[in-house]
Curated annotation (Swiss-Prot):
The modification N6-(pyridoxal phosphate)lysine is found at residue 113. Its EC number is 4.3.1.18. This is Probable D-serine dehydratase. One of its GO terms (molecular function) is pyridoxal phosphate binding. The gene is dsdA. GO terms for biological process: D-serine catabolic process; isoleucine biosynthetic process. Coiled coil: none annotated. Transmembrane segments: none annotated. Its cofactor is pyridoxal 5'-phosphate. It comes from Burkholderia lata (strain ATCC 17760 / DSM 23089 / LMG 22485 / NCIMB 9086 / R18194 / 383). HAMAP family: D_Ser_dehydrat. Gene3D superfamilies: 3.40.50.1100.
Length: 446
């Protein structure tokens, strides 16, 4: 366990003790709706990311045969989840309609990290190719898969620090274009993720420390290595905008499903949060489209609520979960982050409705509930947000939020973001299910 000698004041006053108890809780953001920072990315920046991903679709279809049927689009289904709602005993007459956003099924990388990771590597490839005269600004992006481009990219190294899924997305995309790729992985990273990267020719450097140490090691390598690009999960605008670009497609999916989003038909989006880049980007993109009619809540482990801690402490100085006596140890490897993104937390101070925490036992119970109700197999991190809708009616804080915003939950739409799982080996899924059933049996016997 790592601690720093530091006095931390959190709001409300009883929050520190509640966090240290490691009992799940819902924290509401008292600053939600405050003005965004003056340097916050605007709609134009999101539109630029959308345009980049669109013009690279033919390239993606050429690089990855599995994208042929989608013409190179990196998108996931929006799956109705009424059965899950019933499994969790949350009736539709008090909770509206439920959907699962299936980023666990995103092609190639199998997780939400494909959105930001692919976008950043594509932006880098465009920049290098244009700089060296291989690509015109309006040119066909399939030139980035040419022998000349690959030769140029081979002289460059893409470096990232990760607990797993971002490393997978960066490593796969970079190696597909011919870049040298190095992924620094924390002690939380699963062995199968390391093996999958190595099979792609990616160099994996393993660290005994946590996520922050892996990121720091990657940053140090990039600082000392010529022609290298560091993908900074803690502060990359390119990653952030790649995630934000997902909002427009979700809006189209909701419209296709007949779900309105307006003053009388609120949208609730529940997203697992690690360092904050992916959920923060999605929240930013959705707020740009729907404004006050969308309510975004993050899900964090009871041992690693880094965004909650940073926002509750204020933005004056960085505060980590170690500073409040937590150990950052969780089965949710993708969420095992001690310090929230310095890029994202100031934005979330304005945009985020709240954060709810989840125990490892709940992760597995929710993973099992999703599998029973829908047949979808998730990794533990991806199941973190499943309990989000229930907090709104089963907790005093949630009921207060609904009352203060004059929300009729019967008219609401809930999107639970499933962030990863389709690439998990079958034996790992069997282990998840077995552990979940054992926990359920133990709970029933107490």
């Amino acid at each position: 366990m790592r601690y720093r000698s530091m006095t931390v004041t959190l709001q409300p006053a009883d929050l520190l003790a509640r966090l240290q108890s490691r009992h799940p809780l819902l924290w509401l953001n008292p600053h939600a709706g405050s003005p965004l920072p003056h340097d916050a990315p605007g709609p134009g920046a999101i539109a630029t990311a959308e345009a980049r991903l669109a013009r690279c679709e033919p390239l993606m279809a050429e690089l990855f045969p599995e994208l042929a049927t989608s013409a190179g689009k990196i998108e996931s289904p929006l799956m109705p989840a009424d059965n899950l709602q019933r499994t969790l005993s949350l009736p539709a007459d008090t909770h509206g309609a439920w959907f699962i956003k299936r980023d666990d099924a995103l092609p190639i990388a199998g997780s939400i990290k494909a959105r930001g990771g692919f976008h950043e590597v594509l932006a880098l490839a465009e920049s290098i190719a244009i700089e060296h005269g291989l690509l015109e600004p309006a040119g066909d992006r399939r030139i980035l898969a040419s022998a000349a481009a690959r030769e140029r990219f081979a002289a460059h190294t893409v470096i990232v620090g990760s607990t797993g899924n971002l490393g997978l997305s960066i490593g796969v995309m970079a190696s597909a274009l011919g870049f040298e790729s190095v992924v620094h992985m924390s002690t939380d990273a699963k062995p199968w993720k390391k093996a999958r990267l190595r099979q792609r020719g990616v160099r994996v450097i393993e660290h005994d420390g946590d996520y922050a140490q892996a990121v720091a090691a990657g940053r140090a390598q990039a600082r000392n290595q010529p022609r290298s690009h560091f993908v900074d999960d803690e502060g990359s605008l390119m990653l952030f905008l790649g995630y934000a670009a997902s909002a427009r497609h979700l809006a189209a999916q909701l419209a296709e499903a007949g779900r309105r989003v307006d003053a009388t038909h609120p949208l609730f989006v529940h997203i697992p949060c690690g360092v904050g880049g992916a959920p923060g980007g999605i929240a930013h993109g959705l707020k740009a489209l729907f404004g006050e009619h969308v309510h975004c809540f993050f899900a964090e482990p009871v041992a690693s609520p880094c965004m909650l801690v940073q926002l509750a402490a204020g933005l004056g100085k960085p505060v980590s979960v170690y500073d409040v006596g937590l150990d950052n140890r969780t089965e949710a490897d993708g969420l095992a982050v001690a310090q929230a993104s310095h890029l994202v937390s100031p934005l979330m101070a304005s945009l985020l409705s709240g954060v709810f925490t989840v125990s490892d036992a709940q992760l597995y119970a929710q993973l099992l509930a999703v599998q029973h109700a829908t047949g979808v197999e998730l990794e533990p991190s991806a199941a973190a947000a499943v309990g989000g809708p229930g907090w709104l009616t089963r907790s005093p804080a949630g009921r207060d939020y609904v009352h203060r915003h004059a929300i009729d939950l019967r008219q609401s739409t809930h999107v639970i973001w499933a962030t990863g799982g389709s690439l998990v080996p079958p034996e790992e899924h069997r282990r998840f299910q077995s552990h979940a059933k054992a926990l359920a049996g133990a709970a029933a016997g107490t």
